[in-house]
């Protein structure tokens, strides 16, 4: 009996290793999520396959056809009796990527400056690379999920720790105003105005509540975060086109109107003229009409009373942090790649059809030290796909082609099982079938310059010259990769490679023992699909890793259906009765009136 158990366990272990080595997928990918109990208590980390398990019972084609026909007929009848209204809402999404260089987080690691860097979002999508060292034991052996649990604990604690609970003021980072055009002369206008990009294109943590940019007598505060803005900068697609009544203290999800009610996409974020908001809340940003095409986004500072943690104002509006508890809807690890998604608790019931797909692109082209984790979900009636990747490394000429190949293989091999659900729910089976797609991660694209040349341009803060030699931009313009995808404008220094616990790039002349790597924007966020508007593109300044975290804030249009209730008031009844009395022959076109 004992021999049978030992033999069975050995077979089970060997089966797992073979599956891992050759990237053999199970019928459904497991992931972890919170379980909501009736009393409201959440239990972390349940293993799940999908929100609704794909049907595994084999049925005859006749049975399936009959069932589909019955469902369609029932759905048509329901739609006829209870017509639906499509309501478009805007939800904010915080997306971040961070290569943590194989370091496990300490318990006291402070994530506040990262996750609380802006007004609270409705959805947090956090992607990590190298949460474990990429050694042979972790790549070929059993998966080490210890660091993932630590990250879960830190993220949960940070998201659910409401700033301002101790009567302290929380000042959110504003959304910058995108005013630079794609072909703007980044360096020229700055020299004309005698300003540096580091000061102009950065959000500065305020030590005073207002300052004049050109006043040398006022000391400049320490730079904590550096912002960039959307690359799709053209009329009516900029946050600067927002209505002036748009306020910082209110999330994009507070606005809900139909597309037909607006003349341009940017008007989704504005309210009617007769709508009033609390007057004591600071704005997200200001208009860019006073700036030229080569100017950098202006720095906007909020007053200390503009954002109180959990207080309500006289009009009864509570700040966004009020009751903002977040729950984990999906979490997946593949060796060092780790993707976790958190949503506000009130949105949890509207998140459906959770599915996961992993593609290994590491050793032998199959193992998971490189590759992707993709999570598919349905929010109301809009499908989302979040892809977290760690692509092939290397700064030799031609390595970018291997990264291009990784992207194409991920798009080709990522497959989601079809969910057996109601006829009106979407169930995309690949990445590009989704309505909204966000791709994040350590893409490892380098700058095609020598170390000394790139370092000199970084010190000059000449981002344009650096971006002209950025491999991702070059390959994208040539149509070799990410064709039709978008990325925000970059106004921050390269995020890789830094010396340990330092703001200095590795490999300088004074440190010959360090590995010399040309500074590069390895960590990127791209998106695909209509209805996604990037509001900011940000670099963090944590020294925890040799990479700097990168994160962006998106406003996503989400469609939801509402059944139209039948009204039987006197006016509608009278109108129907009058129409029924009218004589008619074959159709409405042949009506004869008295």
UniProtKB/Swiss-Prot annotation:
Instruction: Please state what is observed when this gene is inactivated.
Output: No visible phenotype. Increased salt sensitivity with reduced production of reactive oxygen species (ROS).
Q: What is its EC number?
A: 3.1.3.36, 3.1.3.86
Composition bias (Low complexity) maps to 262-279
Q: Bias regions of kind Basic and acidic residues — which residues?
A: 251-261
Biological process (GO) annotations held by this record are: cellular response to salt stress; leaf vascular tissue pattern formation; phosphatidylinositol dephosphorylation; regulation of reactive oxygen species metabolic process
Tissue expr? Broadly expressed in emerging organs. Mostly localized in procambium of growing organs. Restricted to vascular differentiating cells of young organs.
Which subcellular locations apply to this protein? Answer: Nucleus; Cell membrane
Membrane topology classification: Peripheral membrane protein
Q: Where is this region: Catalytic 2?
A: 515-530
Its Gene Ontology cellular component terms are: nucleus; plasma membrane
**Misc note:** Cvp1 and cvp2 double mutant displays high PtdIns(4,5)P2 levels.
Q: Which family does it belong to?
A: Belongs to the inositol polyphosphate 5-phosphatase family.
Q: What is this protein called?
A: Type IV inositol polyphosphate 5-phosphatase 7
This chain's source organism reads Arabidopsis thaliana (Mouse-ear cress)
The encoding gene is IP5P7
């Amino acid at each position: 009996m004992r021999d049978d158990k030992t033999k069975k366990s050995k077979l089970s272990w060997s089966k797992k290793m073979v599956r891992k080595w050759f990237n053999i997928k199970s019928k459904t990918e497991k992931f972890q999520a919170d379980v909501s109990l009736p009393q409201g208590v959440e239990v972390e980390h349940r293993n799940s396959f999908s929100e609704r398990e794909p049907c595994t019972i084999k049925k005859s084609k006749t049975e399936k056809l009959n069932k589909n026909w019955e469902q369609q007929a029932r759905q048509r009848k329901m739609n006829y009796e209870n017509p639906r209204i499509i309501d478009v809402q805007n939800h904010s999404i915080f997306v971040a990527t961070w290569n943590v260089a194989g370091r496990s987080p300490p318990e006291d690691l402070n994530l506040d400056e990262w996750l609380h860097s802006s007004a609270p979002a409705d959805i947090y999508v956090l992607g990590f690379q190298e949460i474990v060292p990429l050694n042979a034991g972790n790549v070929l052996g059993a998966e080490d999920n210890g660091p993932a649990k630590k990250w879960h604990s830190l993220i949960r604690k940070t998201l659910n720790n409401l700033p301002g609970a101790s009567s302290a003021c929380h000042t959110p980072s504003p959304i910058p105003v995108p005013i630079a055009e794609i072909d703007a002369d980044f360096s020229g206008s700055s020299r004309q105005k005698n300003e540096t990009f580091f000061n102009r294109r950065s959000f500065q943590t305020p030590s005073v509540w207002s300052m004049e940019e050109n006043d040398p007598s006022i000391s400049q505060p320490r730079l904590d975060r550096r912002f960039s803005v959307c690359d799709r900068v053209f009329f009516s697609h900029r946050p600067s086109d927002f209505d002036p009544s748009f306020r910082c203290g209110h999330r994009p999800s507070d606005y809900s109107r139909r597309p037909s009610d607006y003349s341009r996409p940017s008007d989704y974020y504005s309210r009617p003229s007769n709508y009033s908001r609390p007057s004591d809340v600071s704005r997200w940003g200001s208009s860019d009409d006073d700036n030229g095409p080569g100017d950098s986004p202006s720095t906007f500072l909020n007053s200390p009373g503009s954002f109180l943690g959990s207080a309500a104002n006289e009009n009864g509006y509570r700040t966004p942090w009020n009751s903002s508890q977040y729950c984990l809807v999906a979490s997946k690890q593949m060796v060092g790649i780790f993707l976790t998604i958190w949503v506000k608790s009130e949105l949890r019931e509207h998140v459906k059809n959770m599915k996961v797909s992993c593609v290994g692109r590491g050793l032998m082209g199959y193992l998971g030290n490189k590759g992707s984790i993709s999570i598919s979900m349905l929010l109301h009636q809009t499908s989302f796909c979040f892809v977290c990747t760690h692509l092939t490394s290397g700064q030799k000429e031609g390595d970018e082609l291997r990264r291009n190949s990784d992207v194409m293989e991920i798009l080709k091999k990522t497959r989601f099982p079809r969910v057996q659900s109601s006829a009106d729910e979407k169930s995309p089976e690949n990445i590009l079938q989704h309505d909204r797609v966000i791709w994040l991660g350590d893409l490892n694209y380098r700058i095609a310059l020598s170390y000394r040349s790139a370092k000199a341009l970084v010190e000059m803060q000449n981002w344009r010259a650096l971006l002209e030699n950025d491999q991702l931009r070059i390959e994208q313009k040539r149509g070799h990769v990410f064709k039709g995808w978008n990325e925000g404008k970059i106004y921050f220094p390269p995020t890789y490679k830094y010396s340990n616990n330092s703001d200095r790039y590795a490999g300088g002349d004074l440190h010959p023992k360090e590995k010399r790597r040309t500074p590069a924007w390895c960590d990127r966020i791209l998106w695909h699909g209509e209805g996604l508007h990037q509001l900011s593109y940000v670099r963090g300044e944590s020294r925890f890793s040799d990479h700097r975290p990168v994160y962006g804030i998106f406003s996503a249009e989400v469609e939801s259906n509402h059944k139209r209730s039948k009204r039987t008031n006197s006016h509608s009844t009278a109108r129907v009765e009058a129409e029924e009395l009218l004589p008619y022959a074959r159709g409405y076109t042949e009506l004869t009136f008295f």
